[in-house]
């Protein structure tokens, strides 16, 4: 089973949280595509809805939303994800990955689309150390 690092952004607070997903939590993402919404219960966030906004594979190659499938391809790009031109009209052949989440993906970018009853900050707050 694949392991993922999920970067979850909360647009209400402007904060991002890192989650290490393994086992069944990671299995809920395999086969999904960029733009799909999943239930937050997969990661343990009751009442939340999460939208997949992007991904990166083990070599740092980004996934493009407009490219179907999980495979890596070399495309001639003029703009968008994977290439930012310096000069007008510049094009370059760059490696990009398709929009499907597979076992080769390491990092998944996601955003909260619907919040639950409990704020995300409470899920990630660390207990304070007792002063001695």
Curated annotation (Swiss-Prot):
Going by the entry's taxonomy, the superkingdom of the source organism is recorded as Archaea
What is one GO biological process annotated to this record?
translation
Tell me the SMART domains matching this sequence: Ribosomal_S6e
Q: Which UniProt keywords apply?
A: Ribonucleoprotein, Ribosomal protein
Any matching Pfam family: Ribosomal_S6e
Recall the GO molecular function terms of this protein's record: structural constituent of ribosome
Output the Gene Ontology cellular-component terms.
ribonucleoprotein complex; ribosome
Similarity annotation: Belongs to the eukaryotic ribosomal protein eS6 family.
This protein's name: Small ribosomal subunit protein eS6
Protein source organism: Methanoculleus marisnigri (strain ATCC 35101 / DSM 1498 / JR1)
């Amino acid at each position: 089973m694949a392991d993922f690092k999920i970067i979850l952004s909360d647009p209400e607070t402007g904060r991002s949280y890192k989650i290490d997903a393994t086992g069944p939590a990671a299995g809920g993402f395999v086969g999904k595509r960029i733009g799909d919404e999943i239930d937050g219960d997969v990661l343990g966030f009751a009442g939340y809805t999460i939208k997949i906004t992007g991904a990166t594979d083990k070599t740092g190659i980004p996934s493009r939303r407009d490219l179907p499938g999980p495979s890596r391809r070399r495309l001639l790009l003029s703009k968008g994800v994977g290439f930012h031109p310096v000069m007008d009209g510049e094009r370059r052949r760059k490696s990009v990955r398709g929009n499907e989440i597979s076992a080769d993906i390491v990092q998944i970018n996601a955003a909260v689309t619907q919040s639950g009853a409990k704020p995300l900050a409470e899920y990630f707050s660390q207990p304070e150390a007792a002063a001695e």
